[in-house]
Amino acid sequence: MLLALEPSLKEKIEKQYEEWMACCPNKKKEADAWIKSADEDEAVCMKYLYAYMHPCDIVSYDVEVIASYVKATLDMYANVPYAKRVPAELFFTYVLCVRVNNEDLDKSREWIYRQLVDRVKDKKTMVEAALEVNYWCYEKATYIPSDDRTLAPFGMCNSARGRCGEESTLAVSAMRSVGIPARQCYVPRWAHCDDNHAWVEVWADGDWHYLGACEPEPVLDKGWFTAAASKAMLVLSLIHI
């Protein structure tokens, strides 16, 4: 087994899976069938995702879609050395996690991983890897305002442009695809004007850092929004499994 998990964590996931999936018995049968043929790592990851997944996603997406995230993430875990330094709770919540915002789940994780693995696998630190990922994001998309539903990573890469919420969705997805815990943060209203912004936080080498998605800097914890964010009355970060 690649994942070194405490027995108590595995028991917690198992219990939550059985209780939560009782609301969707037909989907549970499909998930159980997939899990039965999976190895131990795949099984526990699949159970975790379904154990904390929103009911709308449970019924809306085929088991194979969710399984694609599990397989891509475990493939990455086996081949990217620094991924094994990520604590289990962060791995499940901020790496394995399939959703960032309200984007479609588009099975993009494996594709992004293949795009990035050779650029990050030999990086000496996770900070260096995170910076490289953001350079890749900058190569794929730039900013344009919009009010439509959040584009998924494939949509962003195909259109090559999107608002800050879509740029950060792409960046979080890219970070997770190569084993860097990441989450989207946003301010619903700035203190100084009637506007908002979203950016990315990553866990690298033991600490959380922020960065502007698709806005690469030579270091983390730097962005055009630094001063404004320090004055914000409310900063949100939601966990979407």
Question: How would you describe each model-predicted region?
Answer:
Residues 114-121, 125, 129-135, 140-154, ...:
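Hydrophobic/aromatic-rich core segments of domains that either
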Residues 3-159:
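Secondary-structure boundary elements
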